[in-house]
Amino acid sequence: MAKIKPLVDTDIIIDALKGIKPARDLFRRQEIDVYCSILTRKELLSKKGLGSSEGRQIERMLSKVKILRIDNSIQQQFTNLLQKYGDRPEAVADYIIAATALAKNLPLLTRNRKHFEHIREITLSPVYKVE
C-alpha cells in the first residue's frame, strides 16, 4: 500500500504538541510520511518566549517530519502564486506553504483553510475538528 504524504501546516504540528489526538496520531502512523516546509520549522522555533524545554519538544516532533527546503521549483510556484493571486504581505508565508505543496505534489493538511481555499492549484486534505 502506498504511503500517505501530507504537507502539514504549522497549526497541525502545534496541535500535536498540545496532545490533540488526531494530530498526535498523524505522526505515529507508519503508513503516513509527514512533510512540512522549512518555514513551518522557522515559525515553530522562533516563537516569542520559547523556552529550552519547549524547543526540545518541538525538535523531537520535527525529527518525525521530512522538512522541505525552498528549492527552485518551490520558488517558481511561489512566483506564479504571487502573480496570480496578488502580493499581500500577510499572505507571503501561506503562499510559500502552498507553493511547497504544489511543487512537491503533496496535499496540504491545515485547519487554517480560509488562508488556502482560494488557491485552486492545491489539494486541501480533510482535517479533524478540535473541540
Question: What name fits each language-model region?
Answer:
Residues 12-13, 40, 74, 96-97, ...:
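Alpha-helix capping/helix-boundary segments
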Residues 1-36, 46-59, 131:
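Short, well-structured N-terminal submotif of metal-dependent ribonuclease cores
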Residues 13-14, 45, 117, 125:
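Nucleotide phosphate-binding site architecture
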Residues 30, 61-63, 119-120:
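Short, structured coil segments at secondary-structure junctions
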Residues 9-10, 44, 78, 101, ...:
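Generic structural signal for small/hydrophobic residues in well-ordered secondary structure
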